[in-house]
Amino acid sequence: MIRYFILLLYIIFFSSCASKLSKTLKSTDSDYKLKVAENYYAQKKYDKAQVLFEDLFPILKGTPKFEDLYYKYAYSAYYLGDYSNAENLFKTFVETFPTSNKAEEADFMRATCYYRQSPKAELDQTNTTKAMGQMQAFINTHPQSPKVAEATKIIDESRAKLEVKDFKSAELYYNLGFYKAAAIAFTALIDNYPDSNKGDEYKLMVIKSYYLYANNSIEEKQAERYDKVIAECTDFLDRFPESKLVKTVEYYRTESSNNIKSKDEQNKKAA
């Protein structure tokens, strides 16, 4: 019985809320409508505030009140998690009110919307790339902004996510046995993320990939491909002389050199 009573109270409460919004929408008093909308916004009832803000567009457009209304309308979309729409609204705000004291904030929020849409590393990273581009554009446009540090942090986090994405792609080639493609992909990782603290790990994967590529090649191609492994090992030792992976690299260099010598001896005997 108590459960039904509570359910009835919920129904009455939500019906009352819906009724208030409906009555406000029908009102011809724009000041009253705006006041209700701002109350909804202050109470974080962004879905209701959004409806009223949108209804006030044709009435307040061109008036001093329109800037603040549009600003809150954009934030309503953002707080509701509608980041794609919010991005477009913040962009339009900057274009419509370029001299506003809120324009810088809106510009930052536009970039933030792309960042919020950035998915897991395994998925398409278009929005991650856009977030980086927009944040860099924000830094270039507003170099003295207090938001520069946060924008820089987001760029770094986004770049790290792209690095993980590219690593997983390279790793997949390796796990599937496409060793030449893996070697090329791991080389690209090193080139694209020169400041990564995993550079020596990526380089070792280049070496291992080329080694397995040589090992699985036809006999006529093996010597030149082991030479490639040796060249990559030498490059590793030049770049990362203090790496904990040096012994592993020296193993692959020695193995490749021994394989070449073995092939040469076999060829001499065959001759």
Segments from the language model and where they lie:
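Acidic, polar-rich low-complexity tracts and alpha-helical solenoid repeat scaffolds
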Residues: 16-271
